[in-house]
Amino acid sequence: MAAAIEIPTIVFPNSSAQQRMPVVGMGSAPDFTCKKDTKEAIIEAVKQGYRHFDTAAAYGSEQALGEALKEAIHLGLVSRQDLFVTSKLWVTENHPHLVLPALRKSLKTLQLEYLDLYLIHWPLSSQPGKFSFPIEVEDLLPFDVKGVWESMEECQKLGLTKAIGVSNFSVKKLQNLLSVATIRPVVDQVEMNLAWQQKKLREFCKENGIIVTAFSPLRKGASRGPNEVMENDVLKEIAEAHGKSIAQVSLRWLYEQGVTFVPKSYDKERMNQNLHIFDWALTEQDHHKISQISQSRLISGPTKPQLADLWDDQI
């Protein structure tokens, strides 16, 4: 077997412990039905060099991920210290008194003593114990961002997670959080890809020492119709000029922006291809062409119907 690729890491600017996160992670959002496939794919990913694994309570993949990582450690492929595991707090537990129990439950399911990163999945709270997806709007409750964040901070102080952050927060929602936070969020995980580049959010996060992690970096997910990234003629042209795939061009662009990313592929070849982005670069002309790509959001939100103010009109 080919040697595992060494993935670059990024230091959390707001971390006193100089904590490092691999720039590429493996996503595990639900579009699978077989737990065995998930487990096998994760073990294969470890063999290829992946060390960062992204899950969430709502994904239904924590158990399979935990079993796979336990086996990988048992096989001597990796140690727990080498791994970086992220999970997320679902909206039903997005209440101050439920954060710590939710994290403990995730740790038990993952068979881990601590997480490397724990994120608030959405800036929304809903009825405790009433899981539905999409979330019914009538189940939503006021989101106590200050109280929930204090509970997140407590999780970090207890050593149950090494770092805390958020997901799907707009600039405005980040500003609100920063105004009440004692421990600042280290990450905002959001949809980001070449057809949804989020320049304003990237600039705000850079100014405030927050790392952006891109989910749906290849614009796969809840898409209907053509994929504006993978079927883009401009990107096809750039990829051919470099002898690379469109996926590699897309991930290389994110890397050059200082963005981390968690593509999901359980295909052995694509999994490997997604790591071959560190020994070449896009040209200035490539960047100009990419900046001209038409922009639109793919994931509009987790509720039914959609909320008009979820993104605060952010482009």
From Swiss-Prot:
Entry EC no(s): 2.3.1.170
List of residues binding NADP(+): 216-274
Coiled coil region boundaries: none
Induction field: By pathogen infection.
Catalytic reaction equation(s): 4-coumaroyl-CoA + 3 malonyl-CoA + NADPH + 4 H(+) = isoliquiritigenin + 3 CO2 + NADP(+) + 4 CoA + H2O
Family statement drawn from the similarity comment of this UniProt entry: Belongs to the aldo/keto reductase family.
Protein name, UniProt field: NAD(P)H-dependent 6'-deoxychalcone synthase
Protein species of origin: Glycine max
